[in-house]
Amino acid sequence: MIDSLTALQRWYESRCDGVWEHAHGIEVVTLDNPGWKVKLDGATSGKVIDLSIERDESDWISVRATSAEFAGYGGPGNLPELLALAVEWIDWRATNDEGRSDR
């Protein structure tokens, strides 16, 4: 089993074709509240996700994903959880994309 960063790296690399990467990609940034934002776009047939969990003021996640875009937000300690959810979105898409594999 590969870690989340490796899975995201492989997904990104599999998409890069000289054109795609100029308009799409992966974004991981810090928020000023504090927290994290993880965004992936440029996919097709992704799993729709609408998830919001607030455990406490600094331990929370909010994920909205469509078939084409994943947007996840979380507290300062929730980056690994957000990355794992992004990989789940990619893996679902890879196994439900009419036999096409992104790995």
Residue ranges and their predicted role:
Residues 37-62:
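A short, structured beta-strand/loop element
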Residues 54-101:
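Helix-rich interaction surfaces within compact, conserved domain-sized segments
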Residues 8, 12, 49, 82-86:
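Generic structural signal of hydrophobic/aromatic residues within well-ordered alpha-helices
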Residues 1-45:
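Negatively charged, low-complexity tracts enriched in Asp/Glu with abundant Ser/Thr
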